[in-house]
Amino acid sequence: MRLPQDIIIKPYITEKSNMEIGAGKYTFIVDVKSTKTEIKKAVEALFSVKVLQVNTMNFEGKVKRTGVHEGPRPAWKKAVVKIDTDPKPVEYLAKGGKTVTNNKKYKTSIEEFGVAQ
């Protein structure tokens, strides 16, 4: 099991990602080997939010030149994470048919992302 800090590398801030923050979508650069479920658990652990959806994109590293020498840039992975902006308490039935509510508090935004809504 990897730590959440090893999975989420840094936020990916562009004009498009700033516009999607209002809809609850945050963009991160993540570890290339990480899966969607690992990304979901890492974001929920780091930022105390409820993740609804994770979309990932893989990017191949470009070949760059310095004089006559060529070398590749590393491949990277981008994840767009949609969070629940209006979290409601979860209700379920316990033994005996009693209704139990889970009052876990989730945040409605990620303030640590660097951009306020």
From Swiss-Prot:
Entry-linked Gene3D superfamilies? 3.30.70.330
Query: Per the record, what is one GO cellular component?
Result: ribonucleoprotein complex
UniProt keyword Ribonucleoprotein present: yes
Q: Which residues cross the membrane?
A: none
In the record, biological process GO terms are: translation
Q: Which domain of life is it from?
A: Bacteria
Q: Which SUPFAM superfamilies match?
A: Ribosomal proteins S24e, L23 and L15e (SSF54189)
One GO molecular-function annotation for this sequence? Answer: structural constituent of ribosome
Keywords associated with the record = Ribonucleoprotein, Ribosomal protein, RNA-binding, rRNA-binding
- Quaternary state and partners of this protein? Part of the 50S ribosomal subunit. Contacts protein L29, and trigger factor when it is bound to the ribosome.
Relate the protein's function as given in its record: One of the early assembly proteins it binds 23S rRNA. One of the proteins that surrounds the polypeptide exit tunnel on the outside of the ribosome. Forms the main docking site for trigger factor binding to the ribosome.
Query: This chain belongs to which protein, by name?
Result: Large ribosomal subunit protein uL23
Q: Which organism is it from?
A: Ruminiclostridium cellulolyticum (strain ATCC 35319 / DSM 5812 / JCM 6584 / H10)
Native organism taxonomy: Bacteria, Bacillati, Bacillota, Clostridia, Eubacteriales
